A protein has these predicted regions:
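N-proximal low-complexity "stem/linker" segments adjacent to membrane-targeting elements
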Residues: 1-24, 74
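Conserved short acidic donor-positioning loop in nucleotide-sugar-dependent glycosyltransferases
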Residues: 10, 22, 37-42, 50, ...
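Short, acidic, metal-binding catalytic loop of nucleotide-sugar glycosyltransferases
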Residues: 20-29, 50-54
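Glycine-rich, basic loop-to-helix element that forms the pyrophosphate-binding segment
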Residues: 67-70, 77, 84-105
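Acidic/His-rich active-site region of diverse nucleotide-sugar glycosyltransferases
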Residues: 76, 84, 93, 119, ...
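Short beta-strand-to-loop acidic/aromatic patch adjacent to the donor-nucleotide binding site
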Residues: 107-119
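A short, conserved alpha-helix in the catalytic core of glycosyltransferases
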Residues: 186, 191-210, 214-242
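Non-catalytic, C-terminal membrane-associated alpha-helical segments of glycosyltransferases
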Residues: 258-266, 276-321
Length: 321
């Protein structure tokens, strides 16, 4: 059984459309876990009402109380499980609620963590299952992410991490979707699976553990991929698994203050944890980040960046939100 985790935060319409696309998958051996991450816009009720209004003969919707999430055992007819978190502790924490729920189900074989602002090709899951069934050493597998607004152009096939600067970029971003790849070559070239579509084996999750909740936002996928590789799990890419992602080609200029702070602070967090020998090159590179904020007239963000740089060691363990 495949458990698909979809995290919602103030994005009911996207979540509903994501679930609708999942209902068209050409396999039936899956269940969908929707975790509402303490939305402030009545998302949970909107999702529940819309899904209940859909006429889907064999798809039963069940609400599981947050306090019962680790005790509930799914029934055969349960298809969509709704869980509402009482607080928002970030992307990793919200997804971990769904992942833990799946791990408590004896019939779980794989967990597919999927962004709510995605829609999937009907064969996307079939290809992921086939890929991981054929190579048991794969712990985490990614899809070919395609721009939702331009389905001829891919967003990426995994990601690459620059250790010196702790910057990341999507592998083969901007290429035509029609381009053919050797997935084994890609798997060797990438450093992490993009968080919009991460397909985990049960063995990987049981060995490596859950997503690290310290980050709150950004770098969670790099962290868990580095931990998986340290435990000798492979990262896989399945270029035949198409997932359409609604994110724009560039969103950096639109980051909120909190998101910008997380992206800066977490560069130091993950570097200190996995690549301490590069800590000072990453630290120095943040002067360029601060300068760019000032150049754009974002002086509050510039001050936050400098504050993180000069107080990181002192405030280690503090939240970025």
């Amino acid at each position: 059984m495949i458990y698909i985790v979809v995290l919602n935060w103030n994005g009911a319409i996207d979540t509903i459309n994501c679930v609708k696309s999942l209902m068209d998958l050409n396999v039936s051996d899956y269940k969908i876990i929707i975790v509402d991450n303490c939305s402030m816009d009545n998302s949970y009720d909107t999702i529940k009402e819309n899904l209940n209004s859909l006429y889907i003969a064999d798809k039963s919707i069940i609400e599981v109380k947050y306090e019962d999430r680790n005790k509930y055992k799914t029934l055969e007819h349960d298809k969509i499980i709704l869980i509402q978190s009482p607080q928002n502790n970030g992307y990793a924490s919200g997804n971990n609620i769904g992942i833990e729920f799946a791990l408590n189900q004896e019939n779980m074989k794989y967990v597919w963590v999927l962004n709510n602002d995605t829609e999937v090709d009907k064969e996307a899951l079939t290809h992921l299952i086939s890929k991981c069934d054929s190579d048991k050493s794969i712990g985490i597998c990614g899809s070919r992410l395609v721009y939702f607004a331009d389905r001829e152009m891919q967003q990426g096939l995994g990601g690459v991490h620059n250790k010196w600067l702790c910057t990341t970029k999507n592998y083969e971003m901007g290429r035509l979707v029609s381009k053919k790849y050797d997935d084994e070559v890609i798997s060797n070239d990438i450093d992490y699976i993009i968080g919009a579509s991460m397909f985990f084996s049960r063995e990987c999750l049981e060995t490596v553990g859950l997503m690290n909740e310290e980050y709150f936002l950004y770098y969670e996928e790099l962290d868990i991929c580095l931990r998986a590789k340290a435990k000798n799990f492979k990262l896989g890419i399945c270029s035949e698994s198409l997932v359409y992602h609604k994110i724009g080609a560039s969103t950096d200029g639109g980051k909120s203050m909190m998101a910008d702070l997380c992206s800066i602070k977490n560069r130091l967090v993950i570097t200190e944890r996995f690549y301490p020998q590069y800590y000072w090159t990453v630290w120095l590179s943040l002067f360029v980040v601060a300068f760019n904020r000032a150049r754009r007239g974002e002086f509050n963000k510039m001050k936050r960046c400098l504050n993180v740089m000069f107080n990181f060691k002192r405030n280690k363990g503090s939240k970025c939100h």
